[in-house]
Amino acid sequence: MYLRRESILGILYLDVMNKCLLLLVVCICFVSCNSNKPHYITDFQETNTRVTYALSENTTSYIKSLSIFEEQDGKGHLVMASNNAPEIYVYDMSSQKLEKTIVYQREGADGVGPKVGGVLMVNWDCIYLPSLFVPEISQIDSAGHRKKVIPFISDDEGYPFIMTRSVTGAPMYLIEDELYCIQTVNPRLGKDMATDSSVGMKINLKTGEAEAFDFCYPSKLSPDYNSPSLGIETKVSRCYNGRDFIYSFAFDEDLYLVSKDHKQVRRIPARSRYIDELNIPDKIPSDFKLATKQMCEQPFYGDIIYDKYREVYYRIVYPRENLSLEESFSDLWQSGRSRFSIIILDKDFHIIGETLFPENHYRSDLYYVTSEGLFISDSHYKKPDNDEDVLSFRLFMIGASN
């Protein structure tokens, strides 16, 4: 489990009704089984639209937290957190011009700690920065002043929390007065970490109370998960469609449709045609380069994305690779690997397409959705004309499959 713990005529009539009921059940099962089969009727179509954002000298293109902040008038801003400096960059999406660099402090009265795990920008006066060192979230304004600190140690039932983050593919969500946050597999649970780790929690911003979700990581890990690992075994992504959360786990073919309170869970088949076999790696090289190589070759599932404009979902997939030892595996990993595909699912989670993207050209880890379509970064370090001083994106639209 992944949820925490008379007359002859009458007889003839009943017989006929039972047979009719049986026939109806068979028909329903037949239709259901066929409706779960992929129907590849659509694809991603590359367009001529390309947008470019100039990068600060205090960051590289290896951005881990990319999101969109919309004002009440509909104006959109692209928000990036520097991977080097204590800075957040806010761009005007209509002009791609840098509007503001928000500088926050690591120490002192306004200090948020030595390292943050991404950013959630709600408005110019409400920006959340989760700490990567202690279980707390700082709220700052656009001047970098810390307005509040939100600690979370454990919930009322004694569930122990660990640090959270807000990154591309696994952001925090502010829903009404509650922050919905990711939790990774929890080492504070000891021998029960492989089975009892909650996928996340919510924090009531009025009371400060935190509550762990009943929904736990699906039991794909071995009981001795403390053994050496690549770090991708517990990789999780999620999106929110305004009603439910959808979770994608690296080594699980299924998606999980989860109610907002995380008490109702439905498994949804979402298998890629580019992954034949999916297994958690059991032999991990001790050499760092070889381990990173395995990370770049291992097949698994990536981010799940909700497109609210078209009411569809996109699931990123990493097929198996066979790479040369001459590769820079650290750069390749931080560029979203070499190849990837994206599964397209309709609003009812039927697979309607899957597109395999060309190798070493697009970044599976940097993307955003607008009313125009899906923008995917083409700032891949192996692309011959790549410019390290900018972050560029190509617009893709979904259309009829060729």
Spans of features found by a protein language model:
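Beta-propeller blade signature
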Residues: A194-G208, D331-D348, D389-S401
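Beta-propeller fold detector
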Residues: V51, L98-R106, K147-Y159, E211-P218, ...
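Conserved blade-ending motifs and adjacent loop-strand segments that build the rim/top face
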Residues: D110, R271-L278, K283-S286, H350-T370
